[in-house]
C-alpha cells in the first residue's frame, strides 16, 4: 500500500520536472511574463501580422506557420520558393482562427509598437488561440534588440546576431552621414496592394 501511494507522487514529480524542462518563463519586449516552450520545443510560430511574418522569415523561416495576406509578385521574387505557398491566415479582424488552431502553432508572435493596445491584443490573441503570444518591439530603432530577442526565443542566435549586427552597422552609417538640407529628399512609403496605404 505504501509503495502504491508513493508511486503517483513520484510520477507527479517527474511530470513537473519534465514540464519545467520543456518550458521557460520569459519577459517579452512589452514587459509581460510569458511561459513558452524551450527553443528546441518550438516547432511553428503564428505571426500576428505582416511585420511579425517578415521577422520570422528572416530569423527562423522553417518555423513560420504562414503569411497574413497573399504575397504579390514583387514579394515572391525575393522570397525563397519553398516559403511562397505557405497558407494565408489573415490579420487583425480577418484572422482565420479556425485555420490557425487547426495548423497547431506552438506559439504566436506579435511585432509592433509597444503600448497598452498591443498588450491587450496579445492577451486576447492568446485566449483565442490557446497558445502563448510573445510581444516584440517593432520600432525601427529597436531592430537589433528585436532580432536578438527573437533569436534567443527560437534558438536561432547565430542568424539573429548577423541581422542585429547588420542593423547596428546600418544605423551607425546613417548617423555618420552629413546631408545638406537642400540635398535631402522627401519619401513617400506606401503599403497595401496599390501602395496607397500609409
Go through the PLM ranges and name each one.
Residues 67-68, 90-92, 109-113, 135-138, ...:
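Short beta-strand->loop
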Residues 26-32, 103-108, 128-130, 148:
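Acidic/histidine-rich, surface-exposed loop or edge segments in extracytoplasmic proteins
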Amino acid at each position: 500500500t505504501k509503495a502504491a501511494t508513493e508511486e503517483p507522487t513520484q510520477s507527479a514529480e517527474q511530470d513537473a520536472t519534465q514540464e519545467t524542462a520543456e518550458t521557460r518563463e520569459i519577459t517579452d519586449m512589452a514587459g509581460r511574463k510569458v511561459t513558452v516552450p524551450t527553443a528546441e520545443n518550438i516547432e511553428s510560430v503564428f505571426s500576428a501580422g505582416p511585420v511579425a511574418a517578415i521577422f520570422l522569415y528572416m530569423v527562423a523561416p522553417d518555423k513560420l506557420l504562414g503569411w497574413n495576406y497573399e504575397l504579390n509578385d514583387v514579394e515572391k521574387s525575393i522570397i525563397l520558393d519553398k516559403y511562397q505557398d505557405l497558407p494565408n491566415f489573415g490579420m487583425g479582424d480577418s484572422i482565420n482562427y479556425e485555420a490557425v488552431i487547426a495548423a497547431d502553432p506552438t506559439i504566436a508572435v506579435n511585432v509592433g509598437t509597444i503600448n497598452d493596445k498591443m498588450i491587450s491584443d496579445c492577451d486576447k490573441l492568446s485566449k483565442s488561440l490557446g497558445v502563448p503570444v510573445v510581444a516584440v518591439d517593432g520600432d525601427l530603432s529597436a531592430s537589433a534588440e528585436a532580432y536578438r530577442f527573437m533569436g534567443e526565443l527560437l534558438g536561432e542566435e547565430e542568424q539573429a546576431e548577423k541581422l542585429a549586427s547588420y542593423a547596428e552597422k546600418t544605423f551607425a552609417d546613417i548617423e555618420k552621414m552629413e546631408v545638406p538640407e537642400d540635398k535631402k529628399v522627401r519619401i513617400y512609403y506606401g503599403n497595401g496592394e496599390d501602395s496607397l496605404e500609409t
